[in-house]
């Protein structure tokens, strides 16, 4: 596993500059090693994303993180040194909304993945519950991931970084982005004065509001952490019926329009 990690880290450094600046944690600090047992790391030939473990067999991420080959690390903190309970899994099944507009990666940016083998709860592996209610504007939200921690030049940390941001009204994001979709099941979150944001490498990771899993890192501005440029997160609550149907075995379930 050590050799795999060394090769993976070198590849990440080689290609990470080519990733879009819509996926990083800027303005944060190293996450506590015990605060993210639900956070997973997706790696594919130098490309990487975050994921969220929602039960022993299923993870959620962004649809635009989909790749042909994916290795999923659970129980991970430092990419260079494995935790004792760290495990690797692969997708057994992948589900993207069948009614998604595939020409628009912002549309229905959610993917449900069934792991090839279930994981067991341990010190650094445990699922987080799906939301029972949507979050309220003003909520304090936590973002986390292995994305770049500097702008405009990218610097990728060995360990995940965390930052607190705020859930703001959708009108802020609609005013900030000219191409904001007319129908968007997203959450708008950030720090209006700038300085903290998600961006390159954090796509697919969780948005935790008041301790509840509410969003999936989706997209944002070309340059991260700019004033009045919050990022967009897929609103997990709106997709609960689809998620629950797929897990229950209804593989033809569709997402809300």
Swiss-Prot record:
Glycosylation sites: 101, 121, 153, 169, 210, 250
Major subcellular location class: secreted
Signal peptide interval: 1-18
Every Peptidase S1 domain range: 25-248
EC number: 3.4.21.-
Entry annotation: catalytic residues: 64, 109, 203
Record-annotated disulphide pairs: 31-162, 49-65, 97-255, 141-209, 173-188, 199-224
Record has Kinase as a keyword: no
Protein's recorded name: Snake venom serine protease BITS01A
């Amino acid at each position: 596993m050590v050799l795999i990690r060394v090769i993976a880290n070198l590849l990440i450094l080689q290609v990470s500059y080519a990733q879009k600046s819509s996926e990083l944690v800027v303005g944060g600090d190293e996450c506590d090693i015990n605060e993210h047992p639900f956070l997973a790391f997706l790696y594919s030939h130098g490309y990487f994303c975050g994921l969220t473990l929602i039960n022993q067999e299923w993870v959620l991420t962004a649809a635009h993180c989909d790749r042909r080959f994916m290795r999923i690390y659970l129980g991970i903190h430092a990419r260079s040194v494995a935790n004792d309970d760290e495990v690797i899994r692969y997708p057994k099944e992948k589900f993207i909304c069948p009614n998604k507009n595939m020409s628009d990666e912002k549309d229905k940016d959610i993917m449900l993945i069934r792991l090839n083998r279930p994981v067991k709860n341990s010190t650094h592996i445990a699922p987080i519950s799906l939301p029972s209610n949507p979050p309220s504007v003003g909520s304090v939200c936590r973002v986390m991931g292995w994305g770049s921690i500097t702008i405009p030049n990218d610097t990728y940390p060995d360990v995940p970084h965390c930052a607190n941001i705020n859930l703001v009204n959708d009108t802020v994001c609609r005013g900030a982005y000219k191409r904001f979709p007319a129908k968007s099941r997203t959450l708008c979150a950030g720090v209006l004065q700038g300085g903290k944001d998600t961006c390159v490498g954090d796509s697919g990771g969780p948005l935790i509001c008041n301790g509840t899993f509410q969003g999936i890192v989706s997209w944002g501005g070309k340059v991260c952490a700019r004033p009045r440029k919050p990022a967009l997160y897929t609103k997990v609550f709106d997709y609960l019926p689809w998620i629950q149907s797929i897990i229950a075995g209804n593989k033809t379930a569709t997402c809300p329009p």
